[in-house]
């Protein structure tokens, strides 16, 4: 081990720790050679990665710009203020906190800021496409609060707004959550606002999956309808891992800031905030808007190909980057199907579908997403090919080995991270 000096500051991972270097190289190779179709994943730019690995890694900056508990925070203040300015411009809001380490912590901060333990929360059922932090029984949000859940309609698998209203009137929730992790259609934030007003509830919009689409103007904005919006900064925003909390209320941002620090977190990860600032700047460009339009076109192409091949695509298609398929008609399970696709280099995830009778680690569905491979440069032609490969594999019309060769041939044409 090197104690310090010039060598310490110049040594590369490959020289200092070959074991870690080999693992990183292996992951780079995996990302290059496989098709990354997990809806919550994306590829960050080289600029984002550079900021994430910057010397801000070294800096402790407990508190907020202009009010820190440590000295030497001049540049930490500058980068955090820049991130806040950019994200507020991106989503058309007045206030932002860019410090949450994850989407789950962002949601937890809103709970801490606005609720008391035992308060009633109305959220989207995990089984219908919601998220763990929307009141799932295994999550803190379901353990500390009285969680009630709305579902999708059985006829079209879209959010049942009649049920939302009925449950809100019956249970008088302190907060209603509008958001999802496995839902491919538009969310009607205006109707959620009307229901929240009827029962005097806060409205939280958790748009972690849709944030990039919203920023590009290709998905309904939660503002001005929600009281608070949360989102991760990776996924469709194409930034580093982390999260944001946004609002137009000065009163609420004070409560949220206190909930995040000192309520939940200590020092913010300034290197991650620097990377978020870069990602927000990228998302403000016209190039990002065109990228998001391609993301949606590619997802629609994938959904159309799978539907034409006889697969049951939930909701009949997609408005977003997410494509969900129901495998029950083919007598297939999500876990087995996901592993089969992975063996050919197609990476997706097993996913429960609405009213699924299978266990969470089995499931009856698969979830696909288009953001990562769109970032890589693939367009509708490639996604049509990918859809055909998925169908051929699941219908056993092609061997895994042959499919793997075709995947490798495709991915080799779209190389990246050439470092």
Swiss-Prot record:
Q: What keywords would UniProt list here? A: Amino-acid biosynthesis, Cytoplasm, One-carbon metabolism, Pyridoxal phosphate, Transferase
- InterPro entries named in the record: PyrdxlP-dep_Trfase, PyrdxlP-dep_Trfase_major, PyrdxlP-dep_Trfase_small, Ser_HO-MeTrfase, Ser_HO-MeTrfase-like, Ser_HO-MeTrfase_PLP_BS, SHMT-like_dom
Amino-acid biosynthesis listed as a keyword: yes
Could you tell me which Pfam families the record lists for this protein?
A: SHMT
UniProt catalytic activity: (6R)-5,10-methylene-5,6,7,8-tetrahydrofolate + glycine + H2O = (6S)-5,6,7,8-tetrahydrofolate + L-serine
Summarize where (6S)-5,6,7,8-tetrahydrofolate binds, as residue positions.
126, 130-132, 251
Transmembrane residue ranges: none
One example of a Gene Ontology biological process annotation = glycine biosynthetic process from serine
* Pathway where it operates: One-carbon metabolism; tetrahydrofolate interconversion; Amino-acid biosynthesis; glycine biosynthesis; glycine from L-serine: step 1/1
Q: Does the keyword DNA-binding apply?
A: no
The family note in this entry says: Belongs to the SHMT family.
Q: Subunit arrangement?
A: Homodimer.
What is the name of this protein?
A: Serine hydroxymethyltransferase
Q: Which gene encodes it?
A: glyA
